Amino acid sequence: IGASSMHAHQFAQALELQKQHGWAPFVTMQDHYNLIYREEEREMLPLCYKEGVAVIPWSPLARGRLTRPWGETTARIVSDEVGKKLYNESDENDAQIAERLGFIAEETGATRAQVALAWLLSKPGVAAPIIGASREEQLEELLQAVDLTLKPEQIAEMETPYKQHPVVGFK
């Protein structure tokens, strides 16, 4: 059984009810988590780790924003109203993170998408990001992220510019 996109206190209540009633345990949490949206690190990820619940993040590539240089637009980015609500509030700091992601991609010989996914996979409790691909070659590219191990200093370089974001994605 899995849960998705809720506040940590809500999930803690659900976990408690599950235990009280002897119901099947929660084994996964689908949450909004990526290099430019890390609010889940404050409460949800520690709760999941403590409870042994695997995290399967949605939007691991920030709706494509982590796959290309920051100012580069696509038809999807221009027309994606959900993406604008999720990410446009924090453009300046996110641009710094994306720039550093690009440097790490060059340094490792990997793509930006592979580095972003490798970062996620380096986090305790993250089992597998929920990826989306519209072409077979995209899927093949993304799957290679499991073989990429980032150095601690590379992770720190990408994480340092992060600033707190408004919580989005659920009510």
Model region roles, listed by residue range:
Residues 162-164:
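A short beta-strand-loop micro-motif that forms or neighbors metal/cofactor-
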Residues 2-160:
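Beta/alpha (TIM)-barrel catalytic core signal, keyed to glycine-rich beta->alpha loops juxtaposed to Asp/Glu
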Residues 168:
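Substrate/cofactor-recognition hotspot
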